[in-house]
Amino acid sequence: MPNFSGNWKIIRSENFEELLKVLGVNVMLRKIAVAAASKPAVEIKQEGDTFYIKTSTTVRTTEINFKVGEEFEEQTVDGRPCKSLVKWESENKMVCEQKLLKGEGPKTSWTRELTNDGELILTMTADDVVCTRVYVRE
């Protein structure tokens, strides 16, 4: 079983602003979010299939607790409440499908994958736009 535990720092990010745009975030808030999310602090604690993930930026901190295979509530990247279900796609990759609790919006999901090089790759998807963020352990 892969070990996602640790404190992670971002080394690369692609398409984050484009993702926020497709989610309908206005231009001013996008600029603030992109600046704040340029240096997130990510803490992951893992015990088997149970995860705690805390992501902190200068603008907001999010925390999620989940067990792979069990539905839980969280927020989409733009802050809308949703139900999420995480499954293992492969030995080192988890996939999360999100469903909005109310209202309409783009179909959203995320994945987290550990590479053989020790990088953590987070992808966030809204409809056809994919944002990729790459982290290394601190």
From Swiss-Prot:
Disulfide-linked positions: none
Chief location of this protein within or outside the cell: cytoplasm
Gene Ontology cellular component list: cytoplasm; cytosol; endoplasmic reticulum; extracellular exosome; nucleoplasm; nucleus
Covalent link (Glycyl lysine isopeptide (Lys-Gly) (interchain with G-Cter in SUMO)) residue numbers: K102
Known outcome of mutating K31A: Loss of ligand-induced nuclear import
Expression induction: By retinoic acid.
Motif residue range(s): Nuclear localization signal: 21-31
Keyword Cytoplasm listed: yes
Record GO biological process: embryonic forelimb morphogenesis; epidermis development; fatty acid transport; positive regulation of collateral sprouting; regulation of DNA-templated transcription; retinoic acid metabolic process; signal transduction
Function: Transports retinoic acid to the nucleus. Regulates the access of retinoic acid to the nuclear retinoic acid receptors.
Record-given protein name: Cellular retinoic acid-binding protein 2
UniProt source species: Homo sapiens (Human)
Gene that this sequence comes from: CRABP2
